């Protein structure tokens, strides 16, 4: 390190300023790397996978994902990480620290990125667009998972029955069928659920809370998924298309029912006469024949 560089560190002198945002640096090389943020230039490329970064420090951090090296270990639980900032974020789970709070509803988060994604539930912003069907998402990870519908990729397989899923969360939900575990119980009525999110939605039955409101007609819903489906009644969007006949649907569940026309699948069987049905509603209607 040169004598001049050392002097700047001790004096706190930062003579190099960014013309775009005004941020100052002690070295011109640091300013040059910073300016890549504004120009979106990514000159630092990973030799393993070709992924590019705006700063050298980020490509160095990224390369740890290929080596598998995890130098940073949590003192509480022993879990290790390839990057120090990932360890610091993880440690907040143990401390309960949630420094990033939503100004609209007060909900707090461990990570700033989670707060930004959450705030989109208030603004309705969905900047990530599927190139196949045009469906939009508030988070990039949601788009990535959705895209598996189009390519037919189902990498998450149940070890019990072999059923495969495009998204990990659906596999986890499915596995509770085999275990029967329902650890989340409602304090109001005692009803138990296998998933925490299901309990949260259920509690709204008692509270009457409907936080998701349609910007077009003002109708409110207890679940964001219900609002998403409802909005399609205004837009006419039908993102779920049948590969057999091309018919499109606004809900995935409706497409799943429709597919049984082509597959001939009839999972609902009458215990009285053995007649089978493709839809549960048809099965229930049929059973009334035997009760009358």
From Swiss-Prot:
Keyword Zinc-finger applies: yes
Record-listed cross-link Glycyl lysine isopeptide (Lys-Gly) (interchain with G-Cter in SUMO), residues: 157, 169
Compartments where located: Nucleus
Keyword terms, alphabetized: DNA-binding, Isopeptide bond, Metal-binding, Nucleus, Repeat, Ubl conjugation, Zinc, Zinc-finger
GO cellular component terms, semicolon-separated: cytosol; nucleolus; nucleus
InterPro entries in alphabetical order: Znf_C2H2_sf, Znf_C2H2_type
Annotated zinc fingers (C2H2-type), start-end: 16-38, 44-66, 72-94, 100-122, 128-150, 156-178, 184-206, 212-234, 240-262, 268-290
SMART domains for this protein: ZnF_C2H2
Cross-link named Glycyl lysine isopeptide (Lys-Gly) (interchain with G-Cter in SUMO2), sites: 28, 51, 56, 173
Region annotation (Interaction with TERF2IP) ranges: 212-292
Domain of life: Eukaryota
Swiss-Prot/TrEMBL GO biological process terms: regulation of DNA-templated transcription; regulation of transcription by RNA polymerase II
Post-translational modification: Sumoylated.
Signal sequence segment: none
Stored SUPFAM superfamilies: beta-beta-alpha zinc fingers (SSF57667)
Single annotated GO MF: zinc ion binding
Tissues where this protein is expressed: Liver, skeletal and heart muscle, mammary cells. Very low levels in brain, lung, placenta and kidney. Strongly overexpressed in many pancreas and colorectal cancers. Increased gene copy numbers are detected in 3 of 12 tumor cell lines and 2 of 12 primary pancreatic carcinomas. Overexpressed in 80% of colorectal cancers.
Assembly and oligomerization: Binds DNA. Interacts with SUMO conjugating enzyme UBC9/UBE2I. Interacts with the telomeric protein TERF2IP.
Family named by the database record: Belongs to the krueppel C2H2-type zinc-finger protein family.
PANTHER family referenced in this protein's UniProt entry, alphabetically: ZINC FINGER AND SCAN DOMAIN-CONTAINING (PTHR23226), ZINC FINGER PROTEIN ZFP2 (PTHR23226:SF366)
Protein name: Zinc finger protein OZF
Lineage per the UniProt record: Eukaryota, Metazoa, Chordata, Craniata, Vertebrata
Gene that encodes the chain: ZNF146
């Amino acid at each position: 390190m040169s004598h001049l560089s050392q002097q700047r560190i001790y004096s706190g002198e930062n003579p190099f300023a960014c013309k775009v945002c005004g941020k100052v640096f002690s070295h011109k090389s640091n300013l040059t790397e910073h300016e890549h943020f504004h120009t979106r230039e990514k000159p630092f490329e990973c030799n393993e996978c070709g992924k590019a970064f705006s700063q050298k420090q980020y490509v160095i951090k990224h390369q740890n994902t290929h080596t598998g090296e995890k130098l940073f270990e949590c003192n509480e639980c022993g879990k290790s990480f390839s990057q120090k900032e990932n360890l610091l974020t993880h440690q907040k789970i143990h401390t309960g620290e949630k420094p990033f709070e939503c100004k609209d509803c007060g909900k707090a988060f461990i990570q700033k990125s989670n707060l930004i994604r959450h705030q989109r539930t208030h603004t309705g912003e969905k900047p990530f667009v599927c190139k196949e069907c045009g469906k939009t998402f508030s988070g990039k990870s949601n788009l990535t998972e959705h895209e598996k519908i189009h390519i037919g990729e189902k990498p998450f397989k149940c070890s019990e029955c072999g059923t495969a899923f495009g998204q990990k969360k659906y596999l986890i939900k499915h596995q509770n069928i085999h275990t029967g575990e329902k650890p989340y119980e409602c304090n109001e009525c005692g009803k138990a659920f296998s998933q925490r999110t299901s309990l949260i939605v259920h509690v709204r039955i008692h509270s009457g809370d409907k936080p998701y409101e349609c910007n077009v007609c003002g109708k409110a819903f207890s679940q964001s998924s219900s609002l998403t489906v409802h909005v399609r009644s205004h837009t006419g969007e039908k993102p779920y298309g049948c590969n057999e006949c091309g018919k499109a649907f606004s809900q995935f569940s409706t497409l799943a029912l429709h597919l049984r026309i082509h597959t001939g699948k009839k999972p609902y069987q009458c215990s009285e006469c053995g007649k089978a049905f493709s839809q549960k509603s048809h099965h229930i209607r049929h059973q009334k024949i035997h009760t009358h």
